[in-house]
Design a protein with these regions (language model features):
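Specific transmembrane alpha-helix
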Residues: 73-88, 128-142, 207-232, 282-302
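Membrane-proximal soluble regions of multi-pass membrane proteins
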Residues: 58, 370-396
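N-terminal signal-anchor module of multipass membrane proteins
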Residues: 2-79, 86
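Juxtamembrane membrane-water interface segments that cap and precede transmembrane helices
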Residues: 51-65, 188-203, 265-273
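Functional transmembrane helices that form membrane-embedded active or gating regions
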Residues: 14-24, 240-248, 298-328, 372-384
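Alpha-helical transmembrane segments of multi-pass integral membrane proteins
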Residues: 266-370
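Long hydrophobic alpha-helical segments that form multi-pass transmembrane helix bundles
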Residues: 155-227
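Solvent-exposed interhelical
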Residues: 137-155, 223-246
Length: 396
């Protein structure tokens, strides 16, 4: 199972770097969401639960430095990149720019719909609604000049830099602790959680955009897509190395203060909230660095082995397997099904999350061998193009 990278990109018309990033992103997201179901554990730092063992501590530190507020930002960067590819795909088929932007907006509306289904009916941790809203908000920028794109990014990012630490400071002060109690409890049933989410799902994307800077990361995705950093990484290695090295350094340094809280440092809860705000803001750069890092990896792959091809297969079907992963977390960990979240440790929850991701890799590989698209990718494209005959293409 080894192919030339050129053959893969020509035959599949896909960016190897982009799909590798998407496939890995799913692992980071499922690891980020697993602790949210550990309702029997005491709150730790922010959304992390208190460590009960050395292995729990390792999982929490890995989460703070590598996953939390970085996986989400990486997802947003890749979303922005995908919006540009969707626009260019329409223009390459002879559509005018306004029609292409209309298609992108329609796609964003359907992502919101998928997010509603995930949050309300499946009960998973949804971010699709927030990214659908982001797609609608940034769609006018798809036609703008680079100067306008940079100006918009600068204004939005400065506003977030000013307000995010303050908002989180007051938020944690209101909570009165360093961490959040889980949103799930042993008394939850499918009916009760569904009815509650049915009432409050419109608030989810608004709250996410208010508390987390999604838009700057999406705009960064538009920016690196304009330079084709992930489509043509070989031609942009200097930029990729610069962004990745600087971005990872900022991301790791930005995570240091949060890692000290509760062990080496016991600040006021307001200060802890502000530190979390800094962690979130530096995650913007971290998410960008993760994406460009896969540009470097993609440029270095001369022949794709079994694991690389399997990861690419997963990346092509990232929408389908994002939803599947979230559904499996609900089934395995939440009280509405197997209720393991009330009985397993943080480390075991991480192992369950990794197992879910491995299952997704295996299923995606089987689908690739049988030339099968992801069912949600197929559905999304049919909805976008209103059941017209379309070119068969995996991914979204």
């Amino acid at each position: 199972m080894s192919k030339s990278i050129n053959n893969v990109t020509i035959e599949k018309k896909r960016a190897v770097s982009l799909d590798l990033a998407r496939g890995t992103m799913l692992l980071l997201i499922v690891l980020a969401h697993a602790p949210l179901y550990l309702y029997a554990a005491d709150p730790g730092i922010m959304h992390r639960v208190e460590s009960g063992s050395f292995f729990d501590q390792i999982v929490n530190l890995f989460g703070i430095f590598i996953i939390d507020n970085r996986a989400r930002a990486m997802f947003a960067v890749l979303l922005g990149y995908g919006l540009v590819l969707a626009l260019e795909g329409q223009i390459s088929k002879g559509k005018n720019e306004n029609h292409a932007v209309k298609i992108v907006r329609r796609r964003s509306w359907y992502l919101i719909l998928f997010g509603v289904v995930l949050a309300v009916l499946i009960g998973g941790q949804d971010i699709l609604m927030a990214y659908g809203v982001a797609g609608l908000l940034v769609s006018p920028l798809l036609k703008c000049k680079m100067k306008t794109l940079i100006r918009t990014f600068t204004i939005i990012t400065i506003l977030y830099i000013i307000f995010i630490p303050i908002i989180w400071g007051f938020n944690m002060q209101a909570i009165g602790d360093y961490g959040f109690s889980p949103d799930v409890s042993a008394k939850d049933t499918y009916l009760s959680t569904t009815m509650l989410r049915l009432l409050f799902f419109p608030v989810i994307p608004v709250l996410i955009h208010f508390m987390f800077p999604i838009l700057p990361s999406v705009i960064l995705g538009l920016w690196i897509a304009r330079y084709q950093l992930l489509i043509k990484p070989e031609q942009n290695l200097k930029k990729l190395y610069y962004i990745t090295i600087i971005g990872l350094a900022i991301s790791l340094i930005g995570a240091l203060p949060l890692s000290f809280i509760g062990t080496l440092w016991y600040p006021s809860v307001f200060t802890a909230g502000m530190i979390n705000g800094i962690h979130i803001l530096t995650g913007i750069v971290g998410g960008l660095a993760y994406a460009t890092g896969f540009g470097i990896i993609g440029s270095r792959l001369k022949n794709l082995g079994y694991f690389s091809l399997s990861l690419i297969a997963l990346g092509k079907r990232s929408l389908t397997f994002f939803v599947l992963n979230e559904a499996l977390l609900v089934i395995l960990l939440s009280p509405v099904a197997f209720d393991l979240g009330g009985h397993v440790s943080n480390a075991l929850a991480a192992l369950i999350a990794i197992s879910i991701w491995i299952l997704s890799v295996i299923l995606a590989t089987i689908m690739e061998k049988n030339n099968l698209n992801g069912p949600l990718e197929i559905l999304l494209r049919r909805l976008i193009y209103k059941n017209k005959t379309i070119e068969r293409r995996p991914g979204y």
